[in-house]
Amino acid sequence: MKTFYAMRRANGDWFAVADKGDLRMPIFKNSGDAMTARSRDPGMECFRPVTFDAGVLEELRRTEGHTASFLMITDPSRHLKHGLRLSFTELAPFMVT
C-alpha cells in the first residue's frame, strides 16, 4: 500500500486550496516535499504533514462521498495549483500500488 502525505491542522482540518471553483487537497510523495511547500505558502503555517494512505482515503470517502478532489504535487517549489488534478476515483488506484 502506497503512503502519501497531506497537511492537517491539530483540530483535524485538512488543508485545501481553491482551484477553479473547487477545493482540492494537495497530496505529497513525502513529508519533506510537504514541508517545502509549507515554507512557501503562509496559509499552511498551522498545518503539519501527516500520512495519507488508503485508510485516510476511505475515511474521506465516508464523510465526503466521492466528491473529494486532490492535487498530486510533484514539485513542491512551484505553486500548488500546478499539481496534477485528481478526483477521488482517480487517486484511489495510486494508493494500492
Listing of model-derived features with the role each one plays in the protein:
Residues 1-97:
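Conserved NAD+-utilizing ADP-ribose enzyme module
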